[in-house]
């Protein structure tokens, strides 16, 4: 996150709510185009009157998950979406589902956008449009404490569980040995349960989600996290839209506004407790 904050603060030096021009930056894997200039004061409220269908996860704490006590979907992504809604003026309705369904419904234009801790991978960028990164993360491997596994190379021939349709699943398919048995799950809760029981030997998951689980189960978990950081460049999160989405620039401007005025940092401090 330090890299993206540094970038946004650099942009913030030429940004003001009174109408300063913002040179726009696209994802680095897209073809380079001439810098696009947008006036910030012409973006606020430009989506007023629109009601968007938003795909989210109900199982990706602390970003987007179902809170059984509040009986609703909540998390960092949901609060960020709410602030984007306030700035741009749109209303929204949440549709919780797994990643594979999110991608399919975005393609079919049954959803307007998805915000669910979605990694901006090269493969996804060929099919979808993304905002600039709003959260930097990476992948790690989790094993049982009694497994004696201390290194990535030691999971060869082991059973590895991953959530289908995620960057974790893609990493497993691309980099694990042919001797590994990969088991695909609909949600991360089932992965954690099976890993705790020993049904699988390891999992690969986003570090923030791992830290959230370890914190919530500090007194009763039998799991251990390997130190190695994996796949950092393709693990960062962005908001996903159908390819060529008309209002992509508005969302990018709004994200910068929320960073520059301190809103983003407040949400991060509220929801995400990570080791720096």
Predicted feature residues:
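C-terminal motif of bacterial Sec signal peptides marking the signal peptidase cleavage site
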Residues: 16-19
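Extended ligand-binding regions for polar small-molecule ligands
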Residues: 21, 78-87, 146-149, 153, ...
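Ligand-binding clefts/hinges and TM-proximal coupling segments of bilobed small-molecule sensing domains
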Residues: 22-44, 48, 167-186, 221-227, ...
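Extracytoplasmic small-molecule ligand-binding "clamshell" domains
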Residues: 33-117
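Periplasmic-binding protein-like
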Residues: 58, 136-143, 207, 215-256, ...
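Bilobed "Venus flytrap"/periplasmic-binding protein-like clamshell domains
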Residues: 58-61, 73-86, 118, 140-192, ...
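Acidic, polar ligand-binding/catalytic clefts
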Residues: 78, 86, 91-154, 224, ...
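A ligand-binding cleft/hinge motif common to bilobed small-molecule-binding domains
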Residues: 104, 118-126, 171-174, 197, ...
